[in-house]
């Protein structure tokens, strides 16, 4: 999943919005956000998992302490995508279409972009329903777009994506239409 990340750097560099790799990385890993931004991150992650587990039931996968190991790994297993989606795509679409339409377009692009991993045997996505995944993409896009709008930064979005992906190894549940729709609302 590094194509959105790489595209972000190329786009920002080409448009003179960053001078070099160091400035780009500084922009991405700016962790100085107000406490309410991080409260919002935790709130969205808790809502996502509480609803998913409550509606669908769950099994424990990896032990909870593994999050310490899993979370940094998720930076390369999903979180890095946010640099393209929330740092470039969402804000640019918002300039033309406004928040809601931009979020819907971003979620559709994000959903389609993930299609190939549904055909790779052994991935977590190989056993998922692709259309439910699309609803989940819309749900998460709204959460991530809101976090981006509130924080005006991409790091809280990266953290949210890492937490969602990382916790999926610990709290294992099957998505259902009901849980995806309720979470969306």
Spell out what each predicted region is.
Residues 51, 89, 140-144:
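Hydrophobic/aromatic residues in alpha-helical transmembrane segments
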Residues 45-53, 108-117, 162-170:
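Aromatic-anchored segments of alpha-helical transmembrane domains
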Residues 1-78, 149, 169-185:
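Specific transmembrane helices
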Residues 80-107, 149-153:
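Membrane-interface helix/loop boundary segments of multi-pass membrane proteins
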Residues 42, 46, 74-79, 107, ...:
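Residue-level hotspots within the lipid-embedded alpha helices of multi-pass solute transporters
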Residues 128-183:
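Functionally important transmembrane alpha-helices
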Residues 59-71, 121-135:
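Juxtamembrane helix-entry segments on the extracytoplasmic side of multipass membrane proteins
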Residues 35-42, 67-68, 100-105, 131-135, ...:
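Hydrophobic alpha-helical transmembrane segments
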């Amino acid at each position: 999943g590094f194509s959105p990340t790489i595209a972000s750097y190329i786009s920002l560099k080409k448009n003179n919005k960053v001078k070099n790799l160091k400035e780009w990385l500084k922009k991405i890993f700016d962790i100085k956000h107000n406490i309410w931004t991080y409260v919002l991150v935790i709130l969205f992650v808790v809502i996502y998992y509480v609803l998913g587990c409550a509606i669908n039931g769950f099994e424990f996968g990896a032990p909870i302490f593994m999050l310490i190991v899993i979370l940094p790994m998720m930076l390369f297993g999903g979180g890095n995508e946010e640099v393209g989606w929330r740092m470039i795509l969402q804000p640019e679409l918002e300039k033309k279409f406004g928040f809601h339409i931009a979020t819907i377009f971003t979620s559709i692009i994000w959903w389609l972009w993930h299609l190939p991993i549904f055909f790779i045997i052994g991935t977590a996505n190989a056993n998922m329903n692709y259309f439910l995944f699309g609803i989940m993409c819309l749900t998460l896009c709204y959460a991530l777009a809101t976090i981006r709008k509130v924080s005006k930064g991409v790091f809280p979005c990266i953290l949210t994506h890492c937490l969602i992906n990382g916790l999926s190894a610990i709290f294992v549940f099957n998505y259902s239409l009901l849980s995806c729709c309720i979470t969306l609302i």
